[in-house]
Amino acid sequence: MNIEIRRAHPNDAEVLTAIAHAAKRHWDYPEAWIEQWKIDLTITPEFISEHEVFVALVDQKIVGCCALVLSDSLAEIEHMWMRPEQMGSGIGRALFEHAKRHAEERGARVLELSADPNAEGFYARMGAERIGKIPAGMSGDESRVLPRMSMNLNSQTASVFSKVKDQSSQT
């Protein structure tokens, strides 16, 4: 299987939103919850334009996405979604590794995310550790929490990138 990873384009938004909804439905969440998450699962053209969003393609078909929100030395993963039929195929790993390398190149030293409870094992296999939990914000189930996960990035790569960035700003 040949996996291509590229930056998302704003016109990919509708496909990415459909993948996000399909991924949530895969875990048999009640339809009422899916409806509550409708806004959170929507990936807009504006979001794609304002953030670093990557898509994975197989046979020129988008099968997954991962968004990075970068600030200083922190990278936050948002909207990591795979088509359910592609889960477990290695595409998620390739997409995660691509996003991780990109965050390192941009100078991030820490990668954090709030995981769906069903995806916590995947992120743990990628090297992230649970650092806490946050309320899921579900009306009707206030006890539901999301694992908060973090991983240190290759500080050597981040350090080299920061030095290059610092040198270029001095010229």
Regions found by a protein language model. Give the residues of each.
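A short beta-loop-alpha structural element at the N-terminal edge
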Residues: 4-18
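A short helix-loop-beta-strand connector motif used in the catalytic cores of GNAT acetyltransferases and
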Residues: 43-55, 76
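Conserved acetyl-CoA-binding loop-helix of GNAT-fold acetyltransferases
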Residues: 82, 88-101
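Conserved GNAT-fold acetyl-CoA-binding loop/helix
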Residues: 17-43
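Conserved active-site tyrosine of GNAT-family acetyltransferases
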Residues: 123, 128
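Conserved GNAT acetyl-CoA-binding A-motif
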Residues: 103-115
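Conserved beta-strand in the GNAT
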Residues: 55, 61-69, 76-81
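Conserved catalytic-core motifs of GNAT/GCN5-like acyltransferases
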Residues: 112-114, 129-150
